[in-house]
Amino acid sequence: MVNSEEIADGFEPKPVSRSYSGDSSHDRSLSDLNHAAEDLSDKLKNVGLNEVTKEQSEKMMSVSESNGGLDSNAVVTINQEEEEEEEDRDGYGYGDGWSENESENVYPVRPGAEDCSFYMRTGSCKFGSSCKFNHPLARKFQIARDNKVREKEDDGGKLGLIDCKYYFRTGGCKYGETCRFNHTIPKSGLASAPELNFLGLPLRPGEVECPYYMRNGSCKYGAECKFNHPDPTTIGGTDSPSFRGNNGVSIGTFSPKATFQASSTSWSSPRHVNGTSPFIPVMLSQTHGVTSQNPEWNGYQASVYSSERGVFSPSTTYLMNNSSAETSMLLSQYRHQMPAEEFPERPDQPECSYYMKTGDCKFKFNCKYHHPKNRLPKLPPYALNDKGLPLRPDQNICTYYSRYGICKFGPACRFDHSVQPPYSTESSQAIVEPPQVSANGNESDGWN
């Protein structure tokens, strides 16, 4: 009898001693059976097909029957070994409900290794059977995929509870509906609209002051700006910003040292483009110091009260057209009303040349030079024209005055201002003659 384990492993079967008496024909049939078993094991190793196995088993059955049915157990053991080989192949990865077409592209299953991330995302792997990671079966892959989808949904739900800072700050979010954060405004959390200043900009006392508004007096964000926009009456800056409305129209400049009252607010006209205001003479009525509107007012005359400082400022025209007694009284009043801290005294610094010439300084309390208190506008020793500009026949003609009809240096200019400016109203007036009647009674316009 042949051992079944020896046939399955492909080793040569050893003859088994039998108790019954055998003849030479029995030994011959046993050797033939051993050769047939060896051939069958070789074919199973090389081919491994079920059909070949069945044919060989049928041959073995016929051989056993011809030999008197003594070795039928050996054929049964061969069939058992074939079934075990099929089970081994199924356990390697071809079983578990996979079809023959699916088994052609199976990736290696390595339970002890880490799952292939690319295979878990896409269901395929470019490395194929040479990949060193684990490739779970289809149902496991589907379970892992469902778990990841569930995790993403959970994460999205958590992010949806967080408010979108851009949506609540500006009232909109560039991501729109695709944003993962919350865009709903709770009814209980609706903030009241902030108060607006006279320019329509929000007042937010607890926030930082808008730097652009503090420099320019306007804000391009308007009511949606998150910074504070205080009224000009509460600003204490170091410079006089030029306030403009939201439409860009200039309203005026604000002086931080001016004295504001509840009934009126002092505003000054915007400065000249180059930083210095052109000289504008003024006219003063001798009754109670009230400004009188001259019928020949040409637009270059302004009030004697400086709206920027809120104090009385005498004009050169008034000083020239009045007596010395009235002039001294006016200057004493001007000295009394001018605030001491507007032009700082710095004895250790050189005197401000502009202040010493004109009695004024555009930098005011920010000027780093010395401004003596006893400095008053000196009476010019030369005559002035109708615009309050000096007449210096011994000097060259002021080119700025000859071109534009004004002079930004005023009475401190060192040149002559006796030339009639080209933009005079007298020279620009056209003489219109009445129509003349011709001899035939028709009117003529003078061109024919």
From Swiss-Prot:
Where is it predominantly found?
nucleus
Instruction: State the InterPro entries in the record.
Output: Plant_ZF_CCCH, Znf_CCCH, Znf_CCCH_sf
Q: Gene3D superfamilies in the record, alphabetically?
A: 2.30.30.1190, Zinc finger, CCCH-type
**One GO term describing the cellular component:** nucleus
Zn finger limits (C3H1-type)? 110-138, 158-186, 204-232, 346-374, 392-420
Record's keyword annotation contains Nucleotidyltransferase: no
Is Isomerase among the key words of this record? no
**Ranges for region Disordered:** 1-106, 424-448
Q: Where is the composition biased (Basic and acidic residues)?
A: 24-45
| Residue ranges with Polar residues bias | 63-79, 437-448
- Biased region (Acidic residues) positions are 80-89
Compartment(s) where it occurs, according to its Swiss-Prot or TrEMBL record: Nucleus
- Which residues span the membrane? none
A Gene Ontology MF term for this entry?
A: mRNA binding
Pfam families in the cross-refs: zf-CCCH (PF00642)
Q: Which UniProt keywords apply?
A: DNA-binding, Metal-binding, Nucleus, Repeat, Zinc, Zinc-finger
Disulfide links within the chain = none
Protein name from the UniProt record: Zinc finger CCCH domain-containing protein 43
